[in-house]
Amino acid sequence: MFNITISKILARQILDSRGYPTIEVETILSNDIKAKACVPSGASVGKFEAVELRDNDKNFYNGYGVTKAINLINSEVAPQIISMNTLNQEKIDNALIEIDGTDNKSRIGANSTLAISLAIAKAAALALNIPLYQYLGGITAKVLPTPLINVINGGMHADNNLDFQEFMIIPNGANKFEDAIRMSAEVFFQLKQILKHKKLNTNVGDEGGFAPNIRINTEVFEIIIDAVEKSGYKMYEDFSLGLDIAASTFYKDQKYKFADYELNTQELVEYYKKIISQYPIISIEDPIAEEDINGWKLITQELGNKIQIVGDDLFVTNCKLIQNGIDNNMANAVLIKPNQIGTLTETFNAIRLAQKNNYNVIISHRSGETEDTTISHIAVATNCGQIKTGSLSRSERLAKYNELLYIEKLLGISAIYYGSL
């Protein structure tokens, strides 16, 4: 049983939720067990993320093809991984890192290494006849994460005029994950009716949230709060608000350039302090640009004991950058995106480092997603307590929520809902 080895690795090109090519890898074991994994792709990408290998041939999928990566997997990487013990995830991932040979996966691509890494982990779980979350986390894996649900999209995730990228509802008052999803769906339904009544657009963005043309951010807060209350729930007690600012996308010449005005770092931090005092906002992601280091120190000093301050572009799931943030008191939470680093082992190392230093951890999807549900299992395996995987529309987002509902049923009375952040 424990000598089950990898007999085949097959890569192919598929499409993600935006219609862009991505990689699917199928692993076949020596006992004929098969498992597949697909990798996502981001729109707002941190400067220090591991490299996603693309063809850059404008005559083929406008340059977004991944045939180079697939050919590398099938012809070069697979022969070096075949015959390895399926259950030795760390050894396999280290081999992938060594085969690539660069600091940022630029030779074979983090999209290549991650697809292989995830497919092998899935196959190993099947070989042991246990759920993936249990294979990754053991018998202590039982915490269902609080979802940070993106109900209004803006920024680079939608064709509207909102500066901020995500406006999220957080069902912190639910008793179990199933209730959290039901409550959030009821708010989402109500939100659509309110937007229609205001004659605002109810088309959805990349992550399934509505994408209305609203000029003022605080108007979005008011609309979401109205939806929560009309659904019969209370702010703070049942729901809170979260934001993903994606500040790096509008930071230029040491200024934060919004559509109608610009602010320096101090003024932006003061703006955050103001809205936090006026609205039930408990989490802000990427409130400061990744290169504005003094700004990160300032906002953590000013607000770090009041709300969750999440680093995404600042950390990009990289242990060195997370350690630098810890050492310099920047942020108090880390967003984890496996495709930012490229292997399951490195992803878990980043999670453990954050948890060891009392930083909150949020497992996250990307704006260009697939039906793969591995991040749902990673969230439960690590007991991290939070997940971001979009809104309550678009099946590539709902697949993750539905998988968590299934995991909650598998865990039965052992399941614990994380709840308040």
UniProtKB/Swiss-Prot annotation:
Binds a second Mg(2+) ion via substrate during catalysis. GO terms for cellular component: cell surface; extracellular region; phosphopyruvate hydratase complex. Mg(2+) binds at residues 244, 285, 312. Pathway: Carbohydrate degradation; glycolysis; pyruvate from D-glyceraldehyde 3-phosphate: step 4/5. (2R)-2-phosphoglycerate binds at residues 165, 337, 366-367, 388. CDD domains: enolase. Keywords: Cytoplasm, Glycolysis, Lyase, Magnesium, Metal-binding, Secreted. HAMAP family: Enolase (MF_00318). This is Enolase. The gene is eno.
